[in-house]
Amino acid sequence: MRHGDISSSHDTVGIAVVNYKMPRLHTKAEVIENAKKIADMVVGMKQGLPGMDLVVFPEYSTMGIMYDQDEMFATAASIPGEETAIFAEACKKADTWGVFSLTGEKHEDHPNKAPYNTLVLINNKGEIVQKYRKIIPWCPIEGWYPGDTTYVTEGPKGLKISLIVCDDGNYPEIWRDCAMKGAELIVRCQGYMYPAKEQQIMMAKAMAWANNTYVAVANATGFDGVYSYFGHSAIIGFDGRTLGECGTEENGIQYAEVSISQIRDFRKNAQSQNHLFKLLHRGYTGLINSGEGDRGVAECPFDFYRTWVLDAEKARENVEKITRSTVGTAECPIQGIPNEGKTKEIGV
């Protein structure tokens, strides 16, 4: 793992993350014009970072947040489509891979269903090699149709890559799912705003450590008339330490190299902190000392996960007992979100 140079090697993947200024757009024509700006940025960045194998742009960087629902549906994209064609050409021209945001992607039943919040991974030949739909939209604000699975794709130089989006990253389950599928780099594209800056920086570092994985975060910056975005795009090592991190500057770029051999060596040979291995070989030292074999315990010990898999409605019922039974709350009502219909009494 290296930081400070502009190169890469046969063993390292050069990764750039961008603090892209959050655009405020309203029409398809504006979206296309902005996509061309992103494409120009990709080509320009490769001139300055000749080792760049992968560039990552934030959630909402292509379209911005469409606060008007009619605009959201009108600008929803097909994949492949005009936007991805622009990005594909840039990746070919720059001989680099890229991760780009489409907010949103037309639902199969468009316009009767809400669009998806989608990322695409495009290789240096201009091919879409991964399309990920955000599994956990940022409710109650985001109105995207939820996706349903994560993916792992062999990326530049064979590095295995998963994509996740913004609020996905607040749930340890999604990181673990990607890592257990073999991801060596988890890319988190986000359009995260204040006040959650410290929490999001902490979460990315903790999940890199907990899952023995590289993490690349690309976050928005600037003010779009509604939210202020804190940037801090970063590349994080599989030991949870930051290799490179932006500040809050608009269109800031950070760059680092991640070693393919180092992460594979760690996952094979690390012992006390090999979290992926130890989770499925629990207590192996104690079982060896007890004459019960040398592989530890594989069975899942967590009741919540067993219930969720075997009876999802029961798991939902259980969580509502410790939270609430409606998606909204009357103490802070949001238009269009049902709540329990009670109003908080002053002083209670």
UniProtKB/Swiss-Prot annotation:
Keywords associated with the record: Hydrolase
Top-rank lineage group of the source organism: Bacteria
Record-annotated disulphide pairs: none
Keyword Manganese: no
Entry keyword Cell division: no
Catalytic function, reaction form: a monocarboxylic acid amide + H2O = a monocarboxylate + NH4(+)
PANTHER family xref list: ALIPHATIC AMIDASE, NITRILASE C965.09-RELATED
Family of this protein: Belongs to the carbon-nitrogen hydrolase superfamily. Aliphatic amidase family.
Role played: Catalyzes the hydrolysis of short-chain aliphatic amides to their corresponding organic acids with release of ammonia.
Protein name from the UniProt record: Aliphatic amidase
